[in-house]
Amino acid sequence: AGVPFNTKTPYGPT
């Protein structure tokens, strides 16, 4: 992805 949607990981699983 390109936007931080997860609080644990900045960008989550891309």
From Swiss-Prot:
It comes from Acetivibrio thermocellus (Hungateiclostridium thermocellum). This enzyme catalyzes the endohydrolysis of 1,4-beta-glucosidic linkages in cellulose, lichenin and cereal beta-D-glucans. Keywords: Carbohydrate metabolism, Cellulose degradation, Glycosidase, Hydrolase, Polysaccharide degradation. It catalyses: Endohydrolysis of (1->4)-beta-D-glucosidic linkages in cellulose, lichenin and cereal beta-D-glucans. This is Endoglucanase A. Its EC number is 3.2.1.4. One of its GO terms (molecular function) is cellulase activity. It is an enzyme of class 3 (hydrolase). Belongs to the glycosyl hydrolase 8 (cellulase D) family. GO terms for biological process: cellulose catabolic process.
